[in-house]
A protein has these predicted regions:
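Mature hydrolase/peptidase catalytic cores and their serpin-fold inhibitory cores, especially
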Residues: 265, 274-278
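M16 family metallopeptidases and their MPP-like homologs
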Residues: 1-10, 14-45, 63-71, 122-139, ...
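Alpha-helical scaffold elements lining the catalytic groove of polysaccharide deacetylases
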Residues: 44-52
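An aromatic/glycine/proline-enriched structural segment found at the starts
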Residues: 28-34, 62, 67-133, 295-301
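Glycine-rich, charged/polar anion/phosphate-binding loops
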Residues: 52-54, 108-114, 171-175, 276-277
């Protein structure tokens, strides 16, 4: 494994776009040991193969503290002996997991990061917003994120593509986690001609501002998004992977009950336009933005 890692490092050829993305990552959060580049020199001088297994066992070798999620179409009494045999064969003892990585610091002011490093004739624009705190239940937050994402994308497509005709598509992504530290991140992205970048960015913020000022303006889109979320929910929950994921996330995030699952449809239906407007205002207008623009390389380059 070490030899392959060294060979991979020595043969990889990073493009200018790769370097752009690395610098952008370092802007989004302060770099530390968790994301430093592992060079061939580091592997040769600092990594010892005989350390790997003891280090793993030190942190993860014992079964204490693990949560096992088992799904089956068989009655519990039929599979219980097999479960007990498996659990009984796991190593005992205590793992050392006191250390918790705190996560990198995020920008507290808006940043503009632009570079002529792209191979495409179009510019790639990303507007990235981050918050380092989570208010309330993360499941409620993620539901608001899903609703806001769907509505915002519809509104941006209507303006940037249908009205202005300057983009083919618009991407809107949202996410939140409590571990290893609280982080919420929202991204709006699109590709366009370099000369259209600023006009599209200005229009994006205008759309966001109008949504916050007039929640009734997206009531139709809100109902469409709600309908689609409930429809997708009914389909997805037929899969076993859905339940293992929901159980894992509930336990992992220390959610005290299962209402985010049992009351999902009611929770979706209860979200109002004002709720969405307040959420968008907090995430997109009251948060510093990292404006990252990957421009085409100059012809002379």
């Amino acid at each position: 494994v070490m030899d392959k890692s060294i060979e991979k490092y020595r043969t990889i050829r990073k493009t200018d776009a790769d370097l752009f993305n690395t610098e952008l990552r370092n802007i989004l959060r302060t770099p530390d040991y968790t994301d430093r580049e592992i060079s061939d020199t580091i592997i040769e001088n600092e990594v010892k193969a005989e350390w790997l297994l003891p280090a793993y066992n030190h942190c993860f070798g014992a079964a204490e503290g693990y949560t096992f999620i088992i799904t089956s179409d068989q009655p519990l009494q039929d599979i219980e002996p097999f479960i007990e045999t498996y659990l009984g064969g796991l190593p005992g003892g205590k793992s050392c997991t006191e250390y918790v990585h705190k996560g990198g610091k995020i920008p507290v002011e808006s940043v503009v990061f632009s570079r002529k490093a792209g191979d495409s004739p179009k510019a790639v624009v990303s507007l990235i917003f981050q918050q380092d705190s989570i208010d309330g239940n993360i499941m409620d937050l993620n539901l608001k994120n899903d609703v806001a994402k769907g509505i915002l994308r519809m509104k941006l497509l209507a303006v940037l593509r249908e009205k202005m005709g300057m983009v083919y598509s618009v991407g809107v992504s949202v996410g939140a986690t409590q571990h290893p530290s609280a982080l919420c991140r929202e991204t709006i992205s699109f590709s366009c001609l370099p000369d259209n970048v600023q006009a599209l960015v200005d229009s994006t913020f205008l759309v966001i501002g109008n949504m916050c000022d007039d929640p009734d303006s997206f009531s139709g889109e809100l109902e469409d998004v709600k309908t689609n979320l409930i429809k997708d929910w009914k389909i997805t929950k037929q899969r076993s992977s859905f339940w293992t994921t929901q159980i894992r996330n509930t336990l992992y995030n220390n959610i005290p009950d299962w209402k985010h699952i049992t009351d999902y449809e009611a929770r979706v239906k209860n979200i109002t336009s004002e709720d969405v407007a307040d959420h968008i205002r907090k995430c997109f207008l009251k948060t510093p933005v990292v404006k990252a623009v990957l421009l085409p390389k100059d012809d002379k380059e």
